[in-house]
Amino acid sequence: DVPAFKVKGREWLKSQVSRAFLPKYFPNYEKYLWIDCDAWVNNWDTVELYFKACEEGKLGITQTLGPGYKIMSKVNWLFGKLAIIKSQNFKHAIKSKIGINKARKLAFAPHINIGVFSLEKNSPGWVSWQKNLEQTLKNGSIFGSEGLAINMSVYIDELDTEFLPLN
């Protein structure tokens, strides 16, 4: 559930966190493949690859990492061992108040792109993702909470994941 004060009459915002509940909305499927409307499927083999990747409860997903992406994290060294960390995961983790140890663990982990992913119906990934999403929504904004939650599932909860290539 999205806290009411975060929605404030804008029910469409709930769609920003709906992916973690696909089996609830569409219960009659064994495997789920999410593809954002702005993603490009160039070859049907990609769809088959995602379905294969999620076998045995694994999460099939791609990291936001590679030649087409700019550097996603930066460190500004102040002096000695003191530094300011700037990364998407770290920023959202601090804002969501998930704890400094978790935020540090996520700081330089390759960001996961939730625009395309696959999971089986009974994968433990759904429960992990939903639990983390509930935590991130308490203090974080709706935008970014779902992505942070899946990054937590992979890098903190150690959800079994099959990372797929960018192309």
Predicted regions and their residues:
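Glycosyltransferase catalytic domains, chiefly GT-A lineage
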Residues: 1-167
